[in-house]
Amino acid sequence: MNKLSTKLVVAIGIGAALYGILGLWGFSIAPNTFIKPALAILTVFGALFGPVAGLLIGLIGHTVTDTIAGWGIWWGWVISSGIIGFAMGLIQKRVGFSVKNGTYNKGDISYLAITGLIGIVIAIIFAGAFDIIVMGEPFDKIVIQVLGATIADVIVFLVLGLPITIGLAKSNKKHTQLKIEK
């Protein structure tokens, strides 16, 4: 296994703290289901630092949210946040893509959009199945939660996460042409 660099560990810590604290805030759309802008953190940090960082930020951050909120840790949803973060970080594996350097193309943006959407759907279905099978939650309730959470996460991803990530890459692209004068 590769060692985690100090920079990556710090990024995971900051990302998890931001995701954990911002995860306490949201707009209710279904029973125990919220539109949470914090999901944008997973998109941005995943794109910046890769799938391992995205996974750990999702896992740790969601655990922080559940712990602070006091409703107990819902492991299916914690794992789903990790899955989403991992999916968002897959863009980092594309050759030539870098938010930090502002290097990307339309194919990269499409890849991030597709892997992000697929990751959200897989993660939320996993969380719902986990709640039914392991936690003994009623099927009808979970169907509503899964539909609500999927819609909410897709909205946040498309309205906040993706545009912020593209904006960061664009702003960094402007600086790639700068040269140091002697």
UniProtKB/Swiss-Prot annotation:
The UniProt record lists the keyword Protein transport: no
Location in the cell: Cell membrane
Main location: membrane
Lineage, uppermost ranks: Bacteria, Bacillati, Bacillota, Bacilli, Bacillales
Parts of the chain that traverse the membrane: 9-29, 40-60, 71-91, 114-134, 142-162
Topology of the protein relative to the lipid bilayer: Multi-pass membrane protein
Alphabetic keyword roster: Cell membrane, Membrane, Transmembrane, Transmembrane helix
Provenance organism: Bacillus thuringiensis (strain Al Hakam)
The protein's name in its UniProt record: UPF0397 protein BALH_2375
Cystine residue pairs: none
Keyword Membrane attached: yes
NCBIfam families registered for this protein in UniProt: PRK13661.1
Cleaved signal peptide residues: none
InterPro entries in UniProt: ECF_substrate-spec-like, UPF0397
Pfam families: ECF-ribofla_trS (PF07155)
GO cellular component: plasma membrane
UniProt family annotation: Belongs to the UPF0397 family.
